[in-house]
Amino acid sequence: VVEMRNNLNSDPFSIPQEVYDYYRNTFVKRGNSCYRKWFKNYKINKTEEIEKILNGEIKLNFDEILPSFDSSYNNPTRKAGGSLLNIIATNNPLVIGGSADLASSTIAIGVDRDFSSQNKLGRHINFGVREHAMAAISNGLAIHKLRPFCSTFFAFVDYLKPGIRMAGLSKLPTVFIFSHDSIAVGEDGPTHHPIEQLTMIRSIPNVDVIRPADANETKEAYKIAFSKTDSPTCIVLSRQALPTILSEKETEVSKG
């Protein structure tokens, strides 16, 4: 873009130095002061943990902590996803997120209770019916080394599509979880039936889209999503129960 503007003899986009100075002398100084105070208070009993969090160094052995599902498991992939997410979040203090007022339906729920002014260590965020803001907030959390997830019905992905696109462009590992992935949602009617949405999000650059066929593929999807560091993942899950397909091919989910 810079080269194109030069070729067109256009003025370069610039910010006056006094604007930089103003922000450095106000917001930056205030932020640094608050950060030092917070770090001093919090690290008393959690020095090692806080260092790992700030450096994004927490790694999980997913094969050890996540279960496999046998042929008797016959549930929606949203339910399998909810149980897997709970295990991952319990074992990784970086995982934080929530839904656009649909947590009970998408079953994408954070741990340590709701985040609030009274519970700032809570890792479930009630974003409200604000899909676009939810995606933007989640991307901001990813910039600061946390492992955010956000969730809504798949038919509503259009409301947060710009956030997914920005995550791809910015190489952020935000996890977008969508449930109610087909016309099988039934009684909700055509407003809740995703038709063209899958094609749309699959066309977004640098975004992985996984629509697992059963619980074991769902496990692989979550392993992939929470292992990546340079691109977002969309996990598309079902409302209706799906049979577990006993196969060794679920490990090939990462191949697309």
What are these regions (language model features)?
Residues 2-25:
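Conserved phosphoryl-transfer catalytic core
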Residues 25-236, 240-247, 252-255:
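Thiamine diphosphate
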